[in-house]
Regions:
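Hydrophobic positions on the alpha1 helix immediately C-terminal to the Walker A/P-loop
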Residues: 151
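Conserved lysine of the Walker
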Residues: 148
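A noncatalytic interaction/capping subdomain that flanks phosphate/NTP-handling catalytic cores
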Residues: 1-144, 154-164, 172-277
Length: 277
């Protein structure tokens, strides 16, 4: 499969079909030059790649068990529930679940290989939920399970068709010396909410839960710890150095906010009214 995201043509050569199903909305069609387009990147996966992702997920689940309490909506907690279902299943169901698990972990391996290369195209992965309104993008970031997806859903409820989901989980951000653009990708969370678009990024908002809604603009220095935590950190040393350069650029390219919020639409009313100014 040849698909296009972040203005790059990417060919996937995989062992399972799962990742091709995931990326089909982003596939290059023949009438759009897909038949003759050259890939900017070719990604091949191996059994070792799948094993790495499975082992990593198991370590994360073990950490969650030891150092909870786990958030009921967190990725790790959902993984624990899936593992329990797998152990309790009959042999036929277990085989089907194993095939699903392999495919899902291979999809993670594919994206890892992609984002390892992206810093050399001035692009990084920042974990969060991104929504566009009137041609400007807003990214909400926080630890898993805090309510990022819920908050952008409230934006869509509030703003209707004006609000377009860019990516609900793992968007890519291209950063120049003075501006940032955010892209949809197929790796878009459990609800599969994304659009294959590029939108100027206006603001990044750090989200935390609270009973009462409040928002304030913060400095880039205050935002830095969560940026470092939620940005994908490449294993390759050169890519990691470039990622640090891109984070530094991002700190001067967009505005930063801290939002304490509940799950009422009034939270979206507040955040949109302040961040869109």
């Amino acid at each position: 499969m040849l698909f296009r995201s972040a203005e790059k043509n990417i060919r996937i050569i995989s062992l399972c079909d799962t990742v091709h199903v995931l990326c089909r909305r982003y596939a290059l069609k023949e009438d759009a030059g897909g038949a003759s387009a050259e890939p900017d990147l070719v990604v091949r996966t191996t059994e070792e790649d799948i094993a790495f992702e499975i082992e990593k997920s198991e370590r994360e689940r073990e950490f969650e068990r030891k150092y909870g309490p786990a958030d009921p909506d967190s990725d790790a907690e959902n993984g624990i529930k899936r593992e329990e279902a797998y152990r309790n299943a009959d042999p036929g169901t277990r085989e089907r679940l194993e095939n699903i698990r392999r495919g899902n972990h291979e999809s993670l391996a594919v994206y890892r290989k992609i984002v390892e290369k992206m810093p050399f195209w001035d692009t990084l992965l920042l974990h969060g939920s991104a929504v566009a309104v009137d041609g400007q993008a807003y990214l909400f970031t926080a630890r898993s399970g805090t309510g990022k997806s819920t908050h952008t859903r409230l934006w869509r409820e509030l703003l209707g068709d004006r609000a377009v989901m860019i990516n609900d989980d793992k968007p890519l951000i291209r950063v120049s010396d003075s501006a940032a653009e955010i892209f949809g990708t197929p790796w878009d969370g459990k609800h599969h909410l994304s659009t294959n678009i590029c939108v100027p990024l206006k603001a990044v908002c750090i989200l935390e839960r609270a009973e009462e809604n409040s928002i304030r603009e913060i400095s880039a220095q205050e935002a830095l710890p969560i940026l470092m935590q939620q940005t994908y950190r490449p294993m390759d040393a050169a890519a990691m150095r470039q990622t640090l350069v891109l984070i530094s650029r991002l700190m001067t390219a967009v505005r930063f906010f801290r939002l304490s919020c509940n799950m009422d639409v009034s939270a979206a009313e507040l955040s949109y009214s302040v961040m869109s100014r």
